Each structure stands twice: as C-alpha cells, then as structure tokens.
C-alpha cells in the first residue's frame, strides 16, 4: 500500500462541509477514515509488546474536553473551529451528553424516535461540539503517521484539526481512525469534533435501548512509523485430530513502493516468557492471478506442536507478536492474545475442538446506570465475573460490536462471544425495507466488514452475526457470502428472515417455545423440538434470544434446559437480557430512584420495557439469576437408590477435569440434619461417577419432609470466583416412614360469646372477634394486645407482573394480556357479600362457618367458604374451599392476606428458599429451614409488581405469628394495592404494619416472552374448584 503526501490547502471550509449534509446520505459512510484494522499499539520493542507494557506511541485523550450544545449543525458558529464559544463548558470524554445535562435520553424498543423518512433525519438535529487542546512530541510530528482513533461516537461526526477539516464517520459502535499527520503543528493543537445525534446511520441503529449521543468511548493518539503494519490477520487453527496447531498470518504493510523491497515481517508466539514458535519472511505473496502478486502483503504459517487449547473452560492464551523489520532494524511491533481452537459445524452440531457446545448464554447491552452507554474496564470485569459465577459461558454482543477491551477480557477470562454487526431496522415497515434495498448495501457492508477486520483476531469470538431484527434481504445474503469467503474459520448466524433464511449457518430464533408453534405469517416460529426435525433441516439450533427476564419472570426456564439436554441439536441459547437498563435519576420531588422510558420527558417511549435484566442496573442479582445458574450448572445428579443411598454425578465440562471440586451432602428431616458428609470429586471431562453416600439410610421415628441435598463447591479461588464458590446443587425427596404421630387435640373448647354484632371466642390469653355482618375475623388479641391491623380476607389478585401486562407499546391495549382479561372480568373490583356466618361451640373446638359471594355487578362469580376451627391452645385451623364461575379467566392466586403490626423479627420458614420462587420458577430453590430479615423477603423490582413469594411451605414463623400446613407465602411491608398503584419502586411508601399473604394456589409467572400470555397450561389456575388449609397461631 503506497503512502501519498496529503496536503490540506484544498480542504473545504466549515460552511461548505455542513452544506454537503453528509449525515443525510446513506451512501457516505465515511470520508477520509482509515481502513479498519485490529487494535494497534505500535511498540518499538518486541518484549514490551510481548509483555503488553504501555506503549510510548499510544496516548489516551480521555478527560475533560470543552463542549457546546446546539439544536442543529447549522446553529454552530464557525468561530468554534478556532476558539471556544462563550457558552462552552467542560465535559468528560467519554460520556453521553444526555447524562451530562444536555438534551434527553430516549428509550424506545421498536419505534424509531424520529419520523421514519430514511435516509433523511430531522433538520432539528441535536449537535454536540467537542474541542480539545493538545500537544504531540516533535518526534511524532516529524516521523511516521499520527492517527487519532475514536472507539465509539454516536451517531456521526465531522472532525477538524487546527481549523482544517479532517474527515467524517458514521457507525456508532466501531472504531474510526484518521491520519492527523498533515494537520499537526508544533506546540498547541486544537481538535474539534462535531457530533450529530441523528444521521442516515441512525436508520440502522434501531436497537431496543436508550438512544444517547456523544463521544462515549475512549479517544486515542497513535504514532506509527513511516513504514508500518496497517493490517494483521491471525488465524490459529487445529488439525483434524485437534492435536497440533497452525498459526496462519497475513500482514499488510504501508510504505512507499521503493521501501517495500527491503522489508520483512516476523512473528513470534509466546506462552508467558517461553517462545513456542517463530518465523520471518520478506514482504510479497506468490502470484495470485495472471497480473501478479501483492507486494505489500505477506502470508505464512507457524506450526505449533500440541498447543494448549482455548475454550471458555480453559482460556489458554498465547501472545502473538508481529514485527516489521528493515534488514535487522526493528521498525515496529504489534501483539495480540490468541487462542488455538477449532470452531465448526459437523453432523448438525456446533463444535469446539470436536466437542458439541452447550451455549449457556446471555445478551448484554453496554449500559451503566450513571454513565449511560459508557462502560469502564471495571464495569466489564464485574459483568464477566458475575456471568462466570452464575454458570454462563457465552455472551451475545447485542446488538453491536462492543468496546475493544471487552473482547480482550473475554479472551482472558473465558467467554464465548457472538459478535454482532451494528444493524437493526426493527421499526421499518416492512422490517426488511432497507435490507432488501441495494442503495443501502454500502452502509450494511461497512458495518459487517469493518467489524470483522477490527475483531477477527480474538479467540473468544466464535460466531459472527449479521445484525438483529432487520428482516431478510439481499444485503444480508451478500454479506453472508462475504463472511464465508473472508473468514471461513467461524460460522455466521442471523435470525432475521425467519425459519427458512439461508443467510445463517445456525437456526437462531428468538422466543421460540419448547413445544408450542407460533405460526406467524411469513416468519413462523416452530417449537424448538419440532424445528430441528423439519424435513431437510440439518443445522444446529441456538436461540439468539429466549427467556425474557423482564421483572418477575423466567418461568418455564428449566423446561428449555431439559430440552437442550435431551436433544443434542438444541444447543442452548442467550437469555434476554443481562441487566436492567434503568438510569439513576433525581426526580422533580427530590427523590432518587431508577428511571425508565418517559421519565425524561422523552417521546415516544416504551416505558419500563428497557428493564429485562437478570440483574438490577447496579448488578444486584434478581432471583431469576439463581434459577438460570441452577439450570445451566455443569453437573447433573441422579438418585440411584435410597438404601443404600447412592447417586450419580455427571460433569458437563467438555475440556477440564474436576480438579477443584468438592461434593457436600446432607440428609435433612423437616430442616434438621440427620446425616452429612464431604467428598472430593475427581472426574475427567464429560465423566461421571456413582457414589455411595450411606450403606443404609435409617430414619428416626417421626421423620418427615426428608430431603437429600447435594452441592458442588470449589475450595480454591479461581480467576473469577472466591474460595468455596458453589457451582451446582440439587435436591431429592427421600421416602419417610408412613406412620406419623397422631395430632394432639387439646381438651375443651374456647368460650363462645355471642352478641348481635360479633362472635367473640376466648381461649386463655387469646381472643378472636368475628364480625357477624361481614363474616371477617376482624380482631385477634393476645393478652389484651391487638395483633391485626386488617381482617383476614380472601385474596384473588396480584399486582400485575410485566408478563401479565403484555405489550411494550403502552398506548395499545392487548385484550389477550392477563391483566386485561382480569380487568374485563372485574376481578379487581369484586364486591364481597357475606351470605352465611354461623358459630357453634363443640366438644374440642369452637367452629365459625362463613360463606361469601363475590359479585361482578349482580353476578356471583366466586364463592368462598371458610371453616374457622378455634382450639383451646390458641390455634386457628382455617379450612377453605371455593369455586369460580367458568366465565372467569384463570385466577392469578387463591389465598388470603391480612396486615399485622411489625414484629421487628427475622422471617423463618420450612419450605423452598432462600430466594423468591414461584410455581414455574422454583427448580433452584431448596427445601430447608430458612431465616432471613424482613427486608430480604421483598424483591424491589423497579416497576413494582407481585414479588417475594416462597413456595411449598410447611411452616412459617415471624415474631408472634406461626403458620403451618401446605402453602405459599409472602411477608412484606407493602400492600398489593400499593404495588398496583405505584409505577416506580422508589415511590413506595411505608405502611403501618406488615402484610402476610398465604396462598393455597398461585399462578406461574411465565417468561418465554413478555408480550404474549406465556404461562404454561400446567401453571395456570384453570380449575374452577379449590380447597386448602392452614393452622395459624399468634403467641
């Protein structure tokens, strides 16, 4: 590649640059931008490159820049090129200007935030003008090429240096480099960057995220020598036996034609300080056609005997140092971490190093609750550690290439990455309007090809993605074939275009169900088990998005993982998504809380649909993260027999033995430990072992609720976890003796005191009062102190979950959403009429028999019958049966609730825990005796909803209150009504007491998606009759 001397006397002036309106033209993806290439540092010492020392030729320009905000590019004063304007002020780079007090962030999912008129964008186009004064060393200015590199600018920008226009770039998510050499001068230099919020590129950036602007990634200066490496492609490969390796090297040099002949390129491969291979070759390739060869390029290979393989389990990295020489003079060194691995699709399976992968994946946006889309290395490491600790092995860069440092960290810690082009046109009608338009091919092409040219050297990237939700069209087809030709070492995936698209090597649907078909016109989504069995379909299936984790969600998740393990070609998927995309905000009333769409006056907006995370914005886990961790765990357990007590443990690690794992086990009866033990787990990859825990299981008389609990922990700390980290666990119920002790019935019955208004029942210090008109147990005093703040009442509703609410486009009502069906049925406004309230004192109890009709208008839709059995020891046995009209939809819950005074005591229970769990999301919960502070019994979902349930409980103790039976429960300082009527968690107000909710039945939460009713039939309360029973005491 020949260097040309670039003068700038012909450069256009400020107004001429703006008059072109380059940002309105989809065919202009850049002007004067340098070709894409891997990250460079331009070391001048080979060992410094090997050891990744800071390069003296690379300088970061992050820090405080001057900033001026304008309503459009044409509102900017041309004087800005030479001096700061009066209204300029300091702003950090990187940053989004919306997070610095300018303009408003906008959250939309599908809809474009501007009128859909591609390629044109509004004339009123918020514009940020950044300026910086800097100096460069004389040696930089006098020798070689000095580049400026912007790692990410949203959405397009013009660049000036010392008042002279340098160039233009769009594509918010890939580095843009320019040659500054012709524009630099001794001493002070002034850099000016004009960033437009909207550009023709915005039509390709309609991702489900906050729309923000500015220089949001780092800015660098890089000094390269006069003769320099301008591209290096490294392709490590393994042979057919996955034993020996080859490092394919293609390097391109930029130099004058005269200088090329004396140059050579060297490569050395290092593992730590050990050099494992090296080679050097003069520039020039063999002839490629009748016109000759590439004089500026070199292609050669290094043979590596039995290299350590790279995988997410064993991220063995080598350091490849590529050097440019003039004779024996080292001109420059560049270096990258590489890994030897072979990714391929064979026999219908995605394989790494010959082994079929099981993708334990999650989608991740770059988002920080204070900095917007600015993420630091510490943020990245925090995410990676949490992912690894929770059994994730893969991440999809949704839906754009990430900051360069992200890939380096994934290489080192071990995560498989799907790198995705910054292309989404979800808001177009039809969606493929641009992807099938040849006029947009240059824009599509730049985003895909530059992604590959920038990131291909990273071993963590195992799949390229052509983008997201852009329909199917000729542009995708063309780029699929370009990818297959230019990087045959990786498969390509693309979901757009539906079931029959040919632009993908992997079936990668989003939100396909395990069993149920979704016959959507043009793009049907079959049940995943059916999909892989369709005639002629031989590709693996990996869900690019599934398990929509919005709020209280992730029901049915274990069903997916059962299918993945049963059907080899179902190779996992990527949960949507990692973190709630909320922003910390000081609201108008001075309160501080999490903000979502609409909270900044942004229109249009899709409200809370930006909060679909397994973790809160500050990375505090949701309970659903524990469910994901358990379903994805690398060990499977099978109970072989109970006496002797034998289990089989199978490792799903493909590449590493269990050299840091211990099995801890215990047998418990009603939460009390009977037997326990530890043993070292020594399994080869994919190995299993059958273990005898007890030669004979002998249970004491009266044993009940007997469970075997096994967990696998890692006694030693790892790169991503602390010592004693728990990686897997499982419980099995064990048979208990059939004979149970007969319940004791206290002699005598409580006194029954009758008046016209109430039944009053007394037993020692206990006194219960039932209102004869309403039938409600309205008072319960102990030693003269009243315990109830509200009566005990039936509870048939829950504060709607996001999954109950349905569609994200909040102005459109979906009559099929559960909340709309419940509203239409009048479930939230039922009137209770007591039609029976009888009392009698029997030999050993006093019985109050009450029946209520719940009316929708004049129609009886629910009948509830309570039998309250009061005994002399102060116990209330409450037996409830009921029925609903067949015209009602399935109910969200069947139970009761009441408010009591705060006990200032921890909550203890015998049941599933310790975390929140629901009938269709409880595989990760264990049956035991648990104790937690009251605050831990609430999950503060940002959009308040039903939360905090614990299922399959046999006993509950909180302060004076004791409940036994078989039930689900929650104990919280919030009423269902307040949860329903509040739209942000920080607005929740303290109430006088604490609400106890006891459910006989509770509907599942769903979560296959959040816009259709996704609760599976087995988790719906479809029955029209029910009964349950509790024992309550207040001591």
UniProtKB/Swiss-Prot annotation:
Cofactor names: Mg(2+); Na(+)
Textual note on the cofactor: Binds 2 magnesium ions per monomer. Binds 1 sodium ion per monomer.
Binding site for Mg(2+) 1: 424, 426, 469
Residues that bind Mg(2+) 2: 605
A Pfam short name: LacZ_4
Gene: lacZ
A Gene Ontology cellular-component term: beta-galactosidase complex
This enzyme's EC code(s): 3.2.1.23
Keywords attached to this entry: Glycosidase, Hydrolase, Magnesium, Metal-binding, Sodium
InterPro entries xrefs: B-gal_small/dom_5, Bact_Beta-galactosidase, Beta-gal/glucu_dom_sf, Gal_mutarotase_sf_dom, Galactose-bd-like_sf, GH-type_carb-bd, Glyco_hydro_2, Glyco_hydro_2_AS
Family statement: Belongs to the glycosyl hydrolase 2 family.
Protein name, as recorded: Beta-galactosidase
Top EC category: hydrolase
Reactions listed under catalytic activity: Hydrolysis of terminal non-reducing beta-D-galactose residues in beta-D-galactosides
